[in-house]
């Protein structure tokens, strides 16, 4: 995984079709490519990418002070170090320097580590939506919306505002036969989310941009939304 866990429906479909056990891990190309993984058994934890591999250290850092490690259960930037971490980018000292904090590699992902070491990814740092001075993690809102029976899949993104901030909006792939009900969805979200996390608007998409693993590509969906809004204004 990168930046998000596999949607539970993707896991269920794969396991039902193959009869196998899907065990999820997490890493990046710079990590050769994995640093965290679930146990190869039913001890795996759905919604989590697992625990650090042997000889690999992972910590959740305060985004405002990377020297400070967050308490268990508190969101922060995922940092890692270990023998599989790359040494740097070829002929690009500036990018290499930006990728590390001391000996720790900066993954660019936000996550949470529980008391027992299991890690849950929250969002790519670049995908965090800043609205009214608050940070909104798209994955948290998407997880709630995916449980709604009228929604097949969803991408929560920021809709740019003139003042430089963003509105939280949801781009929806509706279930067969379902109709878009913005007010009903807002009421549903208000019962489950803090007020500032509730999407201001819901957009129906026939298809949402995804990668080969079936994960939503939020930045592509956001670009599609912006193009759509610009076309509607013209």
Map each language-model feature to its residues.
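Hydrophobic/anchoring residues in structured secondary elements
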Residues: 1, 156, 203-204
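Conserved AMP-binding/adenylate-forming
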Residues: 1-2, 6-25, 29-119, 125-128, ...
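A structural micro-motif
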Residues: 20, 56, 151-152, 200
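General small-molecule cofactor/ligand-binding pocket signal
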Residues: 23, 202-205
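AMP-binding/adenylate-forming catalytic core of the ANL superfamily
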Residues: 82, 87-88, 110-197, 207-209, ...
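Acidic/polar alpha-helix N-cap and adjacent early helical turns
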Residues: 223-234
